[in-house]
Amino acid sequence: MARTLQGEWMKVEQKGGQVPAPRSSHGIAVIGDKLYCFGGEDPPYESIDNDLYVFDFNTHTWSIAPANGDVPKTRVLGTRMVAVGTKLYVFGGRNKQLEFEDFYSYDTVKEEWKFLTKLDEKGGPEARTFHSMTSDENHVYVFGGVSKGGLNATPFRFRTIEAYNIAEGKWAQLPDPGEDFEKRGMAGFLVVQGKLWVFYGFATANDPKIPTLYGSQDYESNRVHCYDPATQKWTEVETTGFEKPSRRSCFAHAAVGKYIIIFGGEIERDPEAHQGPGTLSREGFALDTETLVWERYEGGPIKPSNRGWVASTTTTINGKKGLLVHGGKLMTNERTDEMYFFAVNSST
């Protein structure tokens, strides 16, 4: 059967400059012809720096953005970042000493950081790591992640979405998806054609009597959910496909049209948990959010090796939209600084 999504992998050349060290558990976002990179770890649980790195797609060189304004003080891992307009939004993360960061923006025109929200205060979002983040034109969304504890009684992982209204500068929690919804970290999280999709991720069992894949209450999930802001309703989505991805977390993902595109990820955690590499994938899959059918994609000979705990985003390079992947953890448990782009050539 002919594949409905065609594309090709390319390795993005990096010619030098102030190049970020290899890392995982960091955040990236693209504004115009610039890629921004923040946070990360190497080795496990060792945060690296608090510099904001800038990659120029025209010169293929790196630089460090000016550190003006309310610069985040903590060197963080397990953080996430998105772009809306000309601003970056960075949420959460922590260092080895369990010092957690808050919510900031960075104006790429003024080249200035701005403190936005103190996390862990009553009535607002709680501090966290290994969460997921996405955005639309008016909102920044944060899903899941691992709890610090904070002032509110909270499970070890979250199952709710926090929505930040950019114009109003206010947070609101979207409707709770219910007890059957898994609490997850490192899940896929995207806005696709106006709806919020949560898929796969590392989950905590709701019922302690339920046996899990690892003999504990933590496991890789394969469930897919969708939230419609128009109706304020959650739906668990039953997907199909001859080549359907196995359970996983910590994978790269992007939205292109009606498609959710994923790559790699952790398909089995390491016996030493985050200290080890686990079993990592180099498979690529695409979900048609209209037909709800998964299919595998290959993308030619230039394909990333097995990896997880990457940073990823949707962007356009050379006129083609696709999935950009930076850094991550390899099967050797080493971190990488490689950058790859899966360019979508056609989709039906």
Swiss-Prot record:
Q: Mutating D270 to A/N has which effect?
A: Lost activity
* Reaction equation(s) it catalyzes: (Z)-N-(sulfonatooxy)prop-2-enimidothioate = allyl thiocyanate + sulfate; (Z)-N-(sulfonatooxy)prop-2-enimidothioate = 2-(thiiran-2-yl)acetonitrile + sulfate; (Z)-N-(sulfonatooxy)prop-2-enimidothioate = allyl isothiocyanate + sulfate; (Z)-phenyl-N-(sulfonatooxy)methanimidothioate = phenylacetonitrile + sulfur + sulfate
Q: What is this protein called?
A: N-(sulfonatooxy)prop-2-enimidothioate sulfolyase
Outcome of substituting C250V: Reduced activity
What are the residue positions of the site described as Essential for catalytic activity?
A: Y45
Gene Ontology biological process = glucosinolate metabolic process; nitrile biosynthetic process
Q: What does this protein do?
A: Specifier protein that contributes to constitutive and herbivore-induced simple nitrile formation. Catalyzes allylthiocyanate and corresponding epithionitrile formation from allylglucosinolate in the presence of myrosinase. Also converts aliphatic glucosinolates, such as indol-3-ylmethylglucosinolate, 4-methylsulfinylbutylglucosinolate, 4-methylthiobutyl- and benzylisothiocyanate, to simple nitriles.
Q: In the UniProt annotation, what is the result of changing S216T?
A: Modified product profile with increased levels of epithionitrile at the expense of isothiocyanate
Per the UniProt record, the lineage of the source organism begins with:
Eukaryota, Viridiplantae, Streptophyta, Embryophyta, Tracheophyta
Mutating E272A leads to what result?
A: Sligthly reduced activity with reduced formation of epithionitrile and thiocyanate, but accumulation of isothiocyanate
How's its activity regulated? Stimulated by the presence of Fe(2+) leading to an increase formation of both thiocyanate and epithionitrile with allylglucosinolate as substrate in the presence of myrosinase. Repressed by EDTA.
Keywords for this protein: Iron, Kelch repeat, Lyase, Metal-binding, Repeat
Spell out the residues of the site Critical for thiocyanate and epithionitrile formation with allylglucosinolate in the presence of myrosinase.
Answer: T154
Q: List the disulfide bonds.
A: none
Q: Per UniProt, where does a (Z)-N-(sulfonatooxy)alkanimidothioate bind?
A: E46, R94, T129, F130, R157, R269, W309, V310
Q: What is the effect of changing Y45N?
A: Strongly reduced activity
